[in-house]
Structure formats: C-alpha cells, structure tokens
C-alpha cells in the first residue's frame, strides 16, 4: 500500500496549483498588491538618484518641495497594498489547507482496512495536521514572500540597469554563483525535511500510544521507558531541525558573500573606469543603495527556499497518501432490505499476499438463522467476519448474499444490511444518545430509548447526571466495560439491519449482565441472520449451527448437541471450558 516514490518539484507545484485554482481571483488580487508593493520600494530607490542630483548638483527647488508629499503618498500606499496582499495570500492559503485537509481526511476514511493494519494513528494524524500545515507555508507565507521579494529584486535590477547598465552587468555576473548555492541547499533541505516529517509522525505516535494506554504504562512501570523513548524521538527531531538550520545558514552566508563580492567589484570598477563610464554621484549612490537593498530580498529568498522545500516535502507526503487506491466501491445499489441468506463458496484468504489464513471455507447461513464460529485464536473466525462486509477483498472464492456475489454490490448497500458488535467497542466523545444513534441520525429519542432498554442500558443511563445527554469521553472512558458493550449492542439494535455480526459481543459483561444481554440478543436475533464469534461456548448453545475452525479450515459443523455427540474438537473445547468454569466457581 505504501507509495514512497519521489515526486518531481514541477509536478508538485502543478498539483498544488490545482488546489489554488478555485481561489484565483483573490490570489490574483494578492499578487498584484505584492507587485505594487515591490514596485514602490524600487521606486524609492530610484528617487534616491533624483533627490541627490536635483538637491546638490543641479538644484531643482520645485522638485525638492514635492519630495515630502511623494514620500507620504508612497509610504501610505505601500502600507495599504502590503496589508491587502498579506490578507489575500493568507486567505488563499487557509482555504487551500481547509480543502486539502478535508480531502485527506475523506481519503483516509475510505482507505482499505489493510492500510489501517500498517499505519498508526500517530502517523495519520501527523499527515492531517503537520504535513498539510507545511503546505500552508508554501501556499501563504512562502508565496507572499517569494512574490514580494522576487518582484523587488527585478525592480531593483531594473533601476540599476536604467541608471548604469555597464556596472549593473558586473553585478549580474554573481547570479549564477547564487544559483549554485541555492541548488545545493535545495536538495539537502528537501531530503532532511522528509526525515523531519517521519520523525514528527513517530513523536505523535509515541505520545498517542502512551496517553491512550496510560493504565498499562503505569501498572507495568513503563513511565521511564516511555519518557526515554519520547525523548529519543524528540532529540532526533531536534537534530534534523538543526541540519535544516545549518543548511539555511550556509545558504544565507554564501549568498551574502557573493553579493558582497559583487558590490566590491562595482565600486572598484567605478573607481578605475571613471574616465570611461560617466556617472553622477546620485546615480552611483543609487546603484550602491540598490545593491545594498538587494541583500535583504535575496537573503529572504534563500531562507525561503528551506520553507518551500519543507512545504514541498509535506505536499509530497500528502499526495502520496492521496494516490493510494480507495476501497473498491462499484456495484449494485440495493433499495430494499435483503432476506439475509449468506453462502461462502471455496473461500481462501491471505493478508497482503502472505500465507493463506482461510483454506477452502464452505458453509451456508440460512436467512433468519444464527451460526456461531468457534475455535482457538488465529483459527480464522474474525477473518470470516471481516470478509462479509468487505473490510478485506477475497483472495479466492465467492461470498454471496441472497445469491448475489458481494463484490457486485456497492459497499454502502452491502454494509447497510449489517450491524456489528465487536469485542473492541468504539464510542465517540459525544452524548450517549448520539452514540446509540450513530449511523441512524434521524432516529427519534423514543427509538433510542427502546434500543437501550432492549440492550439493558436504559437503567444505568438514567442514573447518570445528564441521562442520554451525558458525554461519554474519548472512546467511552467514563463508562465501564460492560456499559460500553451495552451501548454498542443498543446501537446495533437501533440500526435494525437484517444481518447481525456479534464478535465476542458479551465478552466484557459480568455474569448477571451477560444473562440479561443473552436474553435480549435472543430476541433481537429472532428473524435475523446472525454470525456469532465466541470463545465462551456457553453463550452459543442455542445457535442453529456451530462451525468449528482450526488453522483456517472448517473441521466440524452442526448443532451444539450434534457436536457433543461427535466427541470431536468441539466436545473437547466444551469440556475444557466447563472444567475451568467449575474450578472458578469453587475458588469463588
């Protein structure tokens, strides 16, 4: 899934411009304002020649009297266009970032499940927050500074050429050397910027894991280990930042040295060629002033280069993500609910072209019946449950829904027919009502309460300070494990889909809660096609059919009693669990 091939700068610029294009009127206004700003600065430099020549050599009192007014108008206009240009460019940049960030988030939401298996939440957050923000610097700060300073450089060089083209040509000889320095630092900064972005992802990942798993960190005494790991990552980030700073310093000092040599050459030429080149004192000082003024914009442009390279590296990272293929989402759109007959035909599956996890799996779930998958960890139960809603695409074989291959159905239509309650409950930092109604945003409060009652969640919800309007915290941290599980079951009940997938749905409940939930689930499962994954065999006795998995293969299937009578794998598992449960009760 990963795509780390470098993208050429030209293509990056072109692709970035496609995001800027919708805002071109504001961008054009900002560019014109910045050009005018630079033109005023260059005009003031030319005014130096006129002021000196007409004030001290050929005295022109009328012109001298106009100087204060010219300066006042020029500085006022300069301030206005500077503010206008800055506002317009920032507006464009933030608009680009908004669109790009929304595009990245939408793309991540629709990436295949195997991408999430590889990428960490810290890496993804770094792309959404840090990498996209680097693009903002290219779109706003860097672009504004680039336009202002490149226009100022052109304006000052034009002034120099108008005043004395011979001396100006000597200064232009230094530009190729500036280009060599900039080109060298370009490559170095881009390379280091990629490392900086990778490091930021690692820093975010380490912090995210330590914060989310704070209970494990503390109970196992991992505070020092996590702090050391975080410190190493931040130190590595600091070193890379310092490498960028060194590159900037080399860039700036090198360019300043070249410009200083150019100024020295012009002064020497003006002294030694005074008999050949006729130039007034005002013209000579104006050229020197223009060259001195050139130092700042050229310094800014060379420093700006590092910002641009960081932004391009961020853009490359973002575009590499956007180039990843999305889930295949083509097929028929189902308008009505299906009956719910499921069939697996010669199904094989391997994750990322590795060894097969499933081997020639064949079974049928009749509409409205329940089938339980049992077996040791790693036997392929969860893989089967993940293939049904097409979280992963089949390697070989076919899965049908009412006789239709699921690959021929749109993802939205397919998943609309299913509800899922998994062992790892996901709750959002929102109200209990909104968590229950997730995916059914049009549900009424009465429907939400009914679902909660069926899941035996209504009683504890009413005891909370704000009832159904109580916020649950990040991933339901304010609720107990059993309470979170019941909210997830209520969510599945409210969706009222014809197919129900229960992946260890009662694993986090105490014995009393489990008893009530089992009773509720039996009512909810009535008339629905239900796929149950369970380790505790006592919870699936009443399933219409039980399928026993081992090493990705079906080794037995039948009802609870039929499998016990066979005295095979299932009977052994059942005896082991019953013996363990008896011992547990004796200990208690």
Swiss-Prot record:
The chain crosses the membrane at residues 23-43, 56-76, 141-161, 162-182, 257-277, 278-298. CDD domains: ABC_6TM_MsbA_like. Its main location: membrane. It holds the Pfam family ABC_membrane. Disulfide bonds: none annotated. It is an enzyme of class 7 (translocase). This is ATP-dependent lipid A-core flippase. It comes from Legionella pneumophila (strain Lens). The gene is msbA.
């Amino acid at each position: 899934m990963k795509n780390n091939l470098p993208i050429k700068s030209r293509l990056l610029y072109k692709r970035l411009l496609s995001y800027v294009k919708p805002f071109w009127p504001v961008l054009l206004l900002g560019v014109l304002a910045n050009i005018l700003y630079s033109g005023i600065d260059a005009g003031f430099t030319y005014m130096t020649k006129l002021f000196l020549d007409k004030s001290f050599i050929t005295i022109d009192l009328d012109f001298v009297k106009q100087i204060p007014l010219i300066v006042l108008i020029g500085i006022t206009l300069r301030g206005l266009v500077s503010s206008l240009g800055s506002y317009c460019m920032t507006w464009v940049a933030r608009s680009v970032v908004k669109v790009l960030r929304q595009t990245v988030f939408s793309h991540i939401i629709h990436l295949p499940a195997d991408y999430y298996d590889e990428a960490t939440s810290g890496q993804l957050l770094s792309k959404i927050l840090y990498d996209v923000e680097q693009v903002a610097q290219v779109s706003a700060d860097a672009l504004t500074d680039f336009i202002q300073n490149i226009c100022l450089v052109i304006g000052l060089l034009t002034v120099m050429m108008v005043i004395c083209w011979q001396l100006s040509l000597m200064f232009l000889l230094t530009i190729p050397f500036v280009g060599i320095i900039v080109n060298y630092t370009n490559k170095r900064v881009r390379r280091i910027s990629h490392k900086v972005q990778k490091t930021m992802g690692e820093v975010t990942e380490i912090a995210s894991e330590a914060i989310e798993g704070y209970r494990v960190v503390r109970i196992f005494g991992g505070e020092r280990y996590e702090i050391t790991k975080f410190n190493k990552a931040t130190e590595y980030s600091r070193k890379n930042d310092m490498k960028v700073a060194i590159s900037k310093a080399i860039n700036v000092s090198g360019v300043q040295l070249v410009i200083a040599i150019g100024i020295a050459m012009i002064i020497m030429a003006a002294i030694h060629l005074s008999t050949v080149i006729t130039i007034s004192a005002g013209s000579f000082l104006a050229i020197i002033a223009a060259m001195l003024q050139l130092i700042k914009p050229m310094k800014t442009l060379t420093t700006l280069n590092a910002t641009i390279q960081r932004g391009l590296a961020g853009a490359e990272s973002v575009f590499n993500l956007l180039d990843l293929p999305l889930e295949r989402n083509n097929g028929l759109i189902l308008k009505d609910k299906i009956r719910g007959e499921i069939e697996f035909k010669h199904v094989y599956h391997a994750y990322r072209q590795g060894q097969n996890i499933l081997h020639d799996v064949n079974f049928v779930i009749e509409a409205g019946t329940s089938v339980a998958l049992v077996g040791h960890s790693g036997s392929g139960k969860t893989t089967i449950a993940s293939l049904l809603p097409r979280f992963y695409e089949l390697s070989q074989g076919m899965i049908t829904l009412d006789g239709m291959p699921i690959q021929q159905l749109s993802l939205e239509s397919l998943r609309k027919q299913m509800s899922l309650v998994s062992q790892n409950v996901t709750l959002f930092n929102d109200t209990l009502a909104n968590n229950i109604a997730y995916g059914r945003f049009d549900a009424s409060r009465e429907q939400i309460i009914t679902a909660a009652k069926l899941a035996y969640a209504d009683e504890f919800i009413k005891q909370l300070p704000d009832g159904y309007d109580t916020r649950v915290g990040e991933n339901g941290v304010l609720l107990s494990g059993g309470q979170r599980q019941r909210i997830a079951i209520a969510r599945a009940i409210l969706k009222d889909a014809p197919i129900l997938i229960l992946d260890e749905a009662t694993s986090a409940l105490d014995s009393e809660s489990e008893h009530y939930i089992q009773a509720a689930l039996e009512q909810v499962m009535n008339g629905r096609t239900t796929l149950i994954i369970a380790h505790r065999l006592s919870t699936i006795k009443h399933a219409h059919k039980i399928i026993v998995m081992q090493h990705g293969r079906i080794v037995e299937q039948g009802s609870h009693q039929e499998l016990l009578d066979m005295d095979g794998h299932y009977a052994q598992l059942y005896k082991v669990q019953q013996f363990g449960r008896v011992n547990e009760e004796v200990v208690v």
